[in-house]
């Protein structure tokens, strides 16, 4: 192998899987006729040649096979199985286990409808977030995720009520206007998208779920629901547009207020997470504008007294394991778990009144 790590051998294909394989004197695979496969991981040193032996138990030997690295850095399985992180994701039989008190429903993208747990080979902040709020609340928890990547608050997610404005010689669209911007003094030529369309798509999908609560969640039929809070981790696309970055704070304040109004949840808590790559001591330009905006709306910052005790911002740079928002943090599961957990912990503090 090229890299040092823990590996699992899967020799044979079809009937030839029935064999016993040893690597460097250690049995790593056993599949006897009529019995279950037994595989044992082995640590191998990158670049080092080692002997192996395969004893086929049928006449179907074909020599095909492959190996799988078990401890790929940044994967959830490696973090749990080899670094001892997030032990609550597995049961005492070392099987991934779903919670029976936190339910996940995803719409638009990241779709799914299941009890919160590991699966599908994908991860989002909702996994860590759900465990934190689930541990806090005695009542069952519903996480309703409505999301779409590569969307800006200044254009795609622009909330209702935002007006057009001028910046850098351009007029930027207000809610429902199109296109995104146009030269001052010219007539705008609409395109097949408008300011706030992603807001409309995402939150109308959320309404559709909640308006049909009993049908969507028959296990909670007749119980009803209460919206306790919103979680918002966004900002990547806005940093590529100076006009959008300049209004990020105003738009975020309005988003908080309008979501509470739209979902008839005036007391709902609001947790925001900053972009993981953006550091306080080095941020510049548009990235600094967005970071400063996200930090400014935190109720403890003092700029918005009405947000005291009900809006909190999580500074995520210390939690990011590298990469950036535009690369989905290189898919590092620890980044998503730790930021999700931090957002959940922040939500719990707001719910506790701390």
Report residues per predicted region.
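Acidic/polar, compositionally biased interaction segments
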Residues: 1-72
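Cell-envelope and extracellular/periplasmic
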Residues: 73-354
């Amino acid at each position: 192998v090229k890299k040092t790590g823990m590996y699992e051998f899967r020799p044979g294909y079809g009937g030839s899987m029935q064999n016993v394989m040893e690597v460097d004197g250690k049995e790593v695979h056993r599949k006897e006729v009529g019995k279950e496969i037994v595989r044992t991981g082995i640590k191998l040193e990158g670049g080092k040649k080692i002997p192996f032996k395969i004893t086929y138990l049928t006449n179907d030997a074909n020599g095909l096979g492959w190996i799988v690295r078990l401890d790929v850095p940044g994967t959830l399985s490696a973090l749990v199985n080899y670094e001892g992180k997030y032990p609550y994701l597995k049961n005492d039989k070392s099987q991934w286990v779903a919670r029976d008190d936190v339910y996940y429903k995803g719409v638009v993208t990241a779709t799914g409808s299941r009890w919160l747990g590991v699966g599908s080979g994908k991860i989002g902040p909702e996994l860590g977030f759900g465990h934190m709020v689930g541990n806090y609340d005695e009542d069952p928890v519903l996480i309703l995720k409505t999301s779409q990547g590569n969307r800006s608050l200044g254009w795609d997610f622009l909330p209702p009520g935002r007006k057009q404005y001028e910046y850098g010689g351009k007029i930027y669209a207000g809610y429902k206007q199109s296109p995104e911007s146009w030269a001052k003094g010219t007539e705008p030529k609409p395109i097949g998208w408008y300011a706030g369309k992603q807001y409309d798509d995402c939150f109308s999908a959320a309404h559709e779920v909640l308006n049909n609560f009993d049908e969507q969640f028959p296990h909670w039929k007749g119980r009803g629901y209460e919206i306790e809070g919103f979680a918002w981790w966004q900002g990547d696309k806005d940093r590529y547009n100076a006009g959008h970055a300049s209004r990020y704070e105003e738009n975020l304040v309005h988003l908080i207020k309008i979501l509470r109004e739209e979902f008839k949840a005036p007391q709902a808590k609001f947790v925001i997470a900053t972009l993981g790559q953006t550091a306080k001591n080095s941020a510049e330009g548009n990235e600094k504008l967005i970071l400063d905006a996200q930090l400014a709306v935190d109720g403890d910052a003092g700029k918005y007294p009405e947000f005291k005790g009900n809006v909190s911002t999580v500074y995520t740079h210390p939690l990011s394991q590298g990469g950036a928002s535009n690369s989905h943090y290189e898919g590092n599961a620890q980044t998503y778990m730790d930021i999700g957990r931090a957002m959940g912990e922040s939500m719990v503090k707001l719910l506790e009144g701390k």
